[in-house]
């Protein structure tokens, strides 16, 4: 039983890495993981929470290697944007199969595939109880999907950006490599910068800080973690102004 009968947040922006959709696969989308995530999002909708979603594209395309081999960075980033659209289509389909109304909005026009991003329409859809998936990043090269998540979170006036990762919060060091790494329950923006902790890229993080947007990092692969986060229970690491 939750200690809080009501959710801690009314409107959230959920950021999922493309890698989270891979599950144990080395590439692509694991249908079981996709369906589980859709069910967890459905739980939030049933709690009355308005949910915006941004998904990365790293499970389908990573431009760094090709950029090092000589590919133009802008071309690589455009390909990465299209990878996020593919993930968005998969998530929208999974939500529809779970009987959740969802809309997919893209920052680059893809007529007949998904809707163009429209700020006012997105807020209207969220208020009506639909999940809104934001694809194609910010629509600009040189911007990460973490930047897109913070930007969309600020635009839709979300109360928090929930960053779903493979680890259950922010640590003093990489917990996969250092067993003595310490997990933080709460941090200020300044502490993250001073300790040089890896939460997200600097452009995305400073955008969140400048607009007072809290970031909560948690393990999306941990069953029930998302629900615990939105109910205000102890889960993950909260980063905000102190």
Swiss-Prot record:
Residues 23-28 are annotated as: Involved in allosteric activation by GTP. SUPFAM superfamilies: Carbamate kinase-like. It comes from the Bacteria. It catalyses: UMP + ATP = UDP + ADP. ATP binds at residues 15-18, 58, 62, 165, 171, 174. InterPro entries: AceGlu_kinase-like_sf (IPR036393), Asp/Glu/Uridylate_kinase (IPR001048), Uridylate_kinase (IPR011817), Uridylate_kinase_bac (IPR015963). Keywords: Allosteric enzyme, ATP-binding, Cytoplasm, Kinase, Nucleotide-binding, Pyrimidine biosynthesis, Transferase. UMP binds at residues 57, 77, 138-145. Pathway: Pyrimidine metabolism; CTP biosynthesis via de novo pathway; UDP from UMP (UMPK route): step 1/1. Its EC number is 2.7.4.22. GO terms for molecular function: ATP binding; UMP kinase activity. Its main location: cytoplasm. GO terms for cellular component: cytosol. Allosterically activated by GTP. Inhibited by UTP. Homohexamer. NCBIfam families: pyrH_bact. Belongs to the UMP kinase family. PANTHER family: URIDYLATE KINASE (PTHR42833), URIDYLATE KINASE PUMPKIN, CHLOROPLASTIC (PTHR42833:SF4). Catalyzes the reversible phosphorylation of UMP to UDP. This is Uridylate kinase. It comes from Shewanella sp. (strain MR-4). The gene is pyrH.
